[in-house]
């Protein structure tokens, strides 16, 4: 069981590394978007933005898979812990029976304190497992993400691309910076929650 737990944790770490690499690749593509926008080449910027979004989604998918593997590892860890707690509770119960038979109140109190501590530890393990199983949020469509990323990079660098984006088909643009920041905030919160 311990070997399985080790393999699960190792796999989760590998998936997290893949997620970080995809995020790094996404940032590199975003830099290419900026360069293309500086050269007034919106078409190339769109291609690079699509690559950036694809890499970002790939990273989120790797992270999501790592989270699932980590959740399984938590379940295995809980099973191992529960086995140990059950064994300890059996010992405590025997000690409690022995203490009650002699009616030594100090021993009864000591055994009950140990029992309550083990129940609290069990609650903590259960809470950690439930927290690791929280659901993931749904991402918006890639086209909106592409336009949003182009707008964000253009705004951050003071570039004028609104007139060029307005020439695109209806509904292809106009996702604001607040939408991107909201998504990034959500991803940051999820990533922080996964690390804890």
Swiss-Prot record:
InterPro entries: Snf7_fam. Residues 173-196 are annotated as: Disordered. Residues 5-47, 102-124 form a coiled coil. This is Charged multivesicular body protein 1a. It is found in: Cytoplasm; Endosome membrane; Nucleus matrix. One of its GO terms (molecular function) is protein homodimerization activity. The keyword Phosphoprotein applies. The modification N-acetylmethionine is found at residue 1. It is linked to Pontocerebellar hypoplasia 8: An autosomal recessive neurodevelopmental disorder characterized by severe psychomotor retardation, abnormal movements, hypotonia, spasticity, and variable visual defects. Brain MRI shows pontocerebellar hypoplasia, decreased cerebral white matter, and a thin corpus callosum. The keyword Ion transport does not apply. The modification Phosphoserine is found at residues 101, 173. Probable peripherally associated component of the endosomal sorting required for transport complex III (ESCRT-III). ESCRT-III components are thought to multimerize to form a flat lattice on the perimeter membrane of the endosome. Several assembly forms of ESCRT-III may exist that interact and act sequentially. Self-associates. Interacts with CHMP1B. Interacts with VPS4A. Interacts with VPS4B. Interacts with PHF1. Interacts with IST1. Interacts with MITD1. Changing residue 194 to A: No effect on interaction with IST1. It comes from the Eukaryota. Transmembrane segments: none annotated. A motif (MIT-interacting motif) lies at residues 185-195. Induction: By muristerone. Gene3D superfamilies: 6.10.140.1230. Belongs to the SNF7 family. One of its GO terms (cellular component) is amphisome membrane. Expressed in placenta, cultured skin fibroblasts and in osteoblast cell line MG-63. One of its GO terms (biological process) is autophagosome maturation. It holds the Pfam family Snf7. Probable peripherally associated component of the endosomal sorting required for transport complex III (ESCRT-III) which is involved in multivesicular bodies (MVBs) formation and sorting of endosomal cargo proteins into MVBs. MVBs contain intraluminal vesicles (ILVs) that are generated by invagination and scission from the limiting membrane of the endosome and mostly are delivered to lysosomes enabling degradation of membrane proteins, such as stimulated growth factor receptors, lysosomal enzymes and lipids. Keywords: Acetylation, Cell cycle, Cell division, Coiled coil, Cytoplasm, Endosome, Membrane, Neurodegeneration, Nucleus, Phosphoprotein, Protein transport, Repressor, Transcription, Transcription regulation, Transport.
């Amino acid at each position: 069981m311990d070997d399985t737990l080790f393999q699960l944790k190792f796999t989760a770490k590998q998936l997290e590394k893949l997620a970080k690499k995809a995020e790094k690749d996404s940032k590199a593509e975003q830099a290419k978007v900026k360069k293309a926008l500086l050269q007034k080449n919106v078409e190339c910027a769109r291609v690079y933005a699509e690559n950036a979004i694809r890499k970002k989604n790939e990273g989120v998918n790797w992270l999501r898979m790592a989270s699932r593997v980590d959740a399984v590892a938590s379940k295995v860890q809980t099973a191992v812990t529960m086995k140990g707690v059950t064994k300890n509770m059996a010992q405590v119960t025997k000690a409690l029976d022995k203490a009650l038979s002699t009616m030594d109140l100090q021993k009864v109190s000591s055994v009950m304190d140990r029992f309550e501590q083990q129940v609290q530890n069990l609650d903590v393990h259960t809470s950690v497992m439930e927290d690791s199983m929280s659901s993931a949020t749904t991402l918006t469509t890639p086209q909106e993400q592409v336009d949003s990323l182009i707008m964000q990079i253009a705004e951050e660098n003071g570039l004028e691309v609104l007139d060029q984006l307005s020439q695109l088909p209806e509904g292809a643009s106009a996702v604001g910076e607040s939408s991107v920041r909201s998504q990034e905030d959500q991803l940051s919160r999820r990533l922080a929650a996964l690390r804890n």
